[in-house]
Amino acid sequence: MSDILTKIEAYKREEIAAAKRERPLAAIEAIAREASPPRGFVKALRAKHAAGDYGLIAEIKKASPSKGLIRADFDPSALARAYEAGGAACLSVLTDTPSFQGSLDYLVAARAAVSLPALRKDFMYDTYQVVEARAHGADCILIIMAALDDAEAKDIEDAAFDLGMDVLLEVHDAPELERALKLRSPMVGVNNRNLRTFEVTLATSEALAPLIPKDRLMVGESGIFTPADLARLARVGMSTFLVGESLMRQQDVAAATRALLARAA
């Protein structure tokens, strides 16, 4: 496991323990049961594909460990509306505070502002976080294969499916992909950022895409800035993309989203 993930796991496990003390599992489960039903995340992406469009998972991200503050003018509700107006299929909302200045409150606000399904983008180590995600309205969660062993990944995926949520399995190399393909989720994301070096290259997606079965929904993540980047990944069979930083830096987010999704005539 990379140094960055080791540090993140340490503070995450402290966060989880504190959350359990403040709000025991039974209490958060009761809230999750009363939450509005999950909006189909995979379903929304497949609907875009059926219409001949790219499926964009548009990310609401204030900051990152590698780039620092990304957007000072940060209004999750307004950003969600801009993404929806720009043609995004789904939202991804960072809820990790120490590294990304995220918050579960941002997830609640963003989802309430639109009809799009939302992913809780965070580092998941415990099924408690899955229930917590659903209690705050999340329709999908992220499993980072580099952060978990096979048993942990299965437990977290099972917990999400039990709550009617979708799961994005994130991989960065062939061994992680092999492990992810043993799980049930149809959605496999290839992170073009190496979590050990933070180097980003679209060649990662190009190398792994041919290894992903055609019945899986492939997602390209990180390093995607232009329509040319989307076209490059589309050539290896990807039609779903998770994009955050490049859109977060734009003054007119809706227009930037539309421009990114515009296919060459």
Swiss-Prot record:
Reactions it catalyzes: 1-(2-carboxyphenylamino)-1-deoxy-D-ribulose 5-phosphate + H(+) = (1S,2R)-1-C-(indol-3-yl)glycerol 3-phosphate + CO2 + H2O
EC number of the protein: 4.1.1.48
Gene3D superfamilies linked to this entry: Aldolase class I
Signal peptide range: none
The protein's name in its UniProt record: Indole-3-glycerol phosphate synthase
Short name of one Pfam family: IGPS
Molecular function terms from GO: indole-3-glycerol-phosphate synthase activity; phosphoribosylanthranilate isomerase activity
InterPro entries: Aldolase_TIM, Indole-3-glycerol_P_synth, Indole-3-glycerol_P_synth_dom, Indole-3-GlycerolPSynthase_CS, RibuloseP-bd_barrel
SUPFAM superfamilies assigned: Ribulose-phoshate binding barrel
Keywords: Amino-acid biosynthesis, Aromatic amino acid biosynthesis, Decarboxylase, Lyase, Tryptophan biosynthesis
Enzyme class: lyase
Cysteines engaged in disulfide bonds, as pairs: none
Family membership: Belongs to the TrpC family.
Superkingdom in the source lineage: Bacteria
Listed pathway(s): Amino-acid biosynthesis; L-tryptophan biosynthesis; L-tryptophan from chorismate: step 4/5
GO biological-process terms attached to the record: L-tryptophan biosynthetic process
